[in-house]
Amino acid sequence: MRNTGAGPSPSVSRPPPSAAPLSGAALAAPGDAPSALYAPSALVLTVGKGVSATTAAPERAVTLTCAPGPSGTHPAAGSACADLAAVGGDLNALTRGEDVMCPMVYDPVLLTVDGVWQGKRVSYERVFSNECEMNAHGSSVFAF
């Protein structure tokens, strides 16, 4: 019999939703759960010429993930994560290296950092007088 939409359709017996087979995560055994949960730490760092995020086009961008372990496109993810952990994720606490000499040339670069550090949102923007000054601050975090 074909259902044309006119009149009652033939009754079809279906199992109740609770009797449906389990799949995916529902099949996972309790022992398969992660041993410990962690707060995410994942950042996107960009750098571009200029003094304002509205006018400076990003020239380079990297990703930096520090939890559960260092990864991302940052060239020194391990040391950058260690440097951030040492200051509790406070980007303002990253200090300038004393042994770095930079030229006194004004060619401003804008650094932005957005993402999450240990579960808390991060939005950081800073203008450096030139790229050497940016690299001198923040040790390996800003060196990309």
UniProtKB/Swiss-Prot annotation:
UniProt entry keywords in alphabetical sequence: Disulfide bond, Protease inhibitor, Repeat, Secreted, Serine protease inhibitor, Signal
* Positions marked as site (Reactive bond for subtilisin): M104, V105
Source species, domain of life: Bacteria
Q: What does the sequence similarity comment in the record state about its family?
A: Belongs to the protease inhibitor I16 (SSI) family.
Q: Where are the transmembrane segments?
A: none
* Cysteine pairs bridged by disulfides in the record: C66-C81, C102-C132
Protein's name in the database: Subtilisin inhibitor
- Where does the secretion signal sit in this chain? 1-31
User: From what organism does this protein derive?
Assistant: Streptomyces albogriseolus
Per the UniProt entry, the effect of M104 to D/E/V/I/G/P is: Decrease in inhibition
Q: Taxonomic lineage per UniProt?
A: Bacteria, Bacillati, Actinomycetota, Actinomycetes, Kitasatosporales
Q: Is Cytoplasm there in the keyword field?
A: no
Subcellular location per UniProt equals: Secreted
Repeat (sequence) positions are 33-37, 39-43
Could you describe the subunit structure of this protein?
Answer: Homodimer.
Molecular function in Gene Ontology:
serine-type endopeptidase inhibitor activity
